[in-house]
Design a protein with these regions (language model features):
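Aromatic- and acid-rich polysaccharide-binding/catalytic face
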Residues: 120, 124-126
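Histidine/acidic residue-rich metal-binding segments in metalloenzymes
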Residues: 1-120, 133-145
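Active-site glycine-centered loops adjacent to acidic/histidine catalytic or metal-binding residues
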Residues: 152
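Mid-to-C-terminal alpha-helical segments outside catalytic/metal-binding sites
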Residues: 69-70, 78, 88-89, 107, ...
Length: 258
């Protein structure tokens, strides 16, 4: 949501040239969680876990804002990636959008160019997951071609360095076919971002084993660690971490990490 940073909304003609250039050059627009409207902290006393748990789903507000943008009707190939937002919330979001069009459309005058909200979403939006079995189980409601895997490296939500094992566990639990696994792990990304590392490097150099060997030879430590191997003072405490404490941390006050 650019208005959070003092810019015009995505519905303003201010951005028309950007949409045009992105569409002409097949550039995906990445809408990352937290870059615009962040989910509010319920209170300073609320355990920070509550905020972390709800954070990915906060992107639904941005998804709704963009889905109702008439600029999507001008550019059939414009793609928006809902980065780090997960997938599980999407089926109900689309169901609600369908209900809204049928129930409120006569007075809201929403314009989907004769299409349904779900149809427009599948044409223009990409969803990204780190760990989201519920979303994968409902892939038919989202569109398998709209789901991409990510690992969030190097942030705290990342499953690195055990990302391959963690990801395969999810895909295996859900029962994705080999074709579907290839789609969500790399083919969808290659297609939409127009970047094919397999073609550039060779498939034999893009396997988990090959990449881990490259890391080993480069002296990269891929052992599982907490805090990157450093001693984090904020973990040397008893009691629950609250929203207020974390807000102070990011403001440069209170607890710090070495």
């Amino acid at each position: 949501n650019p208005t959070c940073h003092g810019f015009p909304s995505v519905h303003n003609a201010h951005w028309d040239k950007l949409w045009e250039v992105c569409a002409e050059n097949d550039v995906v627009i990445n809408c990352h969680i937290g870059t615009g409207a962040q989910p509010p902290h319920s209170s300073p006393d609320t355990p920070i876990d509550a905020w972390i748990a709800a954070f990915p789903m906060s992107i639904a507000n941005s998804a709704a804002d963009w889905l109702y943008g008439e600029f999507l009707l001008k550019y059939d190939n414009l793609k928006i990636s809902l980065t780090e937002g997960g997938v599980g919330w999407v089926p109900y979001f689309l169901e609600r959008a369908e209900f809204t069009l049928d129930h409120h459309g006569p007075w809201t005058k929403s314009n989907f160019g004769g299409k349904r909200p779900t149809e427009l979403f599948r044409e223009h939006f990409l969803t990204c997951f780190i760990e989201d079995e519920s979303g994968l189980r409902n892939r038919d409601l989202v569109g398998i071609e709209n789901i991409l895997f990510e690992c969030d490296y190097p942030h705290s939500d990342s499953t690195w360095p055990m990302t391959p094992e963690n990801t395969f566990r999810q895909l295996d639990n859900v029962g994705l076919s080999d074709e579907e696994i290839n789609q969500v792990t790399h083919l969808n990304a290659i297609k939409n971002f127009n970047f094919d590392p397999i073609a550039i490097l060779g498939r034999e150099n893009c396997t988990v084993g090959a990449l881990r060997e490259q890391a080993r030879q480069a002296g990269i430590d891929t052992r599982e660690k907490s805090g990157g191997g450093n001693s984090a003072k904020i973990t040397d405490r008893s009691g629950r971490m609250t929203s207020g404490e974390v807000q102070k941390l990011f403001a440069g006050e209170g607890a710090t990490a070495d």
